């Protein structure tokens, strides 16, 4: 199977979350971790000093059923993004979100909360749909 290339606009913040947040270009970042995974591997190792200074806020949520810890970081005054992200995550885990939102709606909500442009969000949705239908050239 040929390796898929990621189109422009898909994942442009990956690995640059802290840099973009400190520049004020990204309001929120989200990382998930499991027991035994180092912060270096998660991607949020550099956030601690800025959390300590109050330049970035940190919200954590541990799900005892899955042993997954979600780490949400935001700029001051953007706390609502972390709170809404956690609410949506809880609704997805319970299944309630899928009675209200389509998967594309959820991708748009998450992308908006994370600070992606509308164009990047739509590029991600098209890319994700193409991965679900490998023999299809249109979405």
Whereabouts are the PLM-identified features?
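An amphipathic, hydrophobic-aromatic interaction surface with interspersed Lys/Arg
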Residues: 104-111
């Amino acid at each position: 199977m040929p390796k898929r290339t990621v189109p422009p606009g898909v994942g442009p913040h990956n690995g640059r979350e802290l840099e973009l947040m400190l520049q004020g270009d990204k309001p929120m970042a989200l990382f998930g971790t499991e027991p035994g995974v180092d912060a270096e591997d998660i991607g949020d190792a550099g956030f601690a000093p800025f959390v300590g200074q109050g330049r970035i806020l940190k919200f954590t949520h541990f799900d005892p059923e899955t042993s997954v810890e979600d780490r949400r970081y935001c700029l001051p005054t953007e706390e609502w993004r972390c709170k809404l992200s956690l609410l949506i995550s809880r609704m997805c885990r319970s299944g309630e979100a899928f009675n209200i939102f389509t998967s594309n709606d959820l991708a748009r909500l998450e992308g908006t909360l994370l600070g992606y442009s509308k164009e990047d969000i739509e590029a991600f949705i098209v890319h994700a749909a193409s991965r679900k239908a490998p023999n299809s050239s249109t979405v």
